Amino acid sequence: MNKGIIYLIQPAELVGTNRYKIGMSNNPDLERCKKGYKKGSRYLCIMECIKPHDLENKIKEIFNNKFKLIAGNEYFEGDDQVMLKLFLEIIKQHNNTNNDNI
């Protein structure tokens, strides 16, 4: 089964704004987060998941309908607590759909 991580972060250059980034890695360790973002980044949530690419696409699709897309296809503007709650709900639904043992 394809395991990896999914995350919601505020890169260091966006701290002090209400802008956040969704990301994923097919590698289930934290190397992507450790090496991919500058010191001072805020990590709102990092979770292990199955089918991380599918989950990231699902989150981006739902976030596109709820928040303002500000850059690329994975940077969004909005309230961090609202985003985090929705992010966790989508992950829970995804995990329940794909693996009852998680």
Report each predicted region and the residues it spans.
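Non-catalytic accessory segments flanking enzymatic or RNA/DNA-binding domains
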Residues: M1-I102
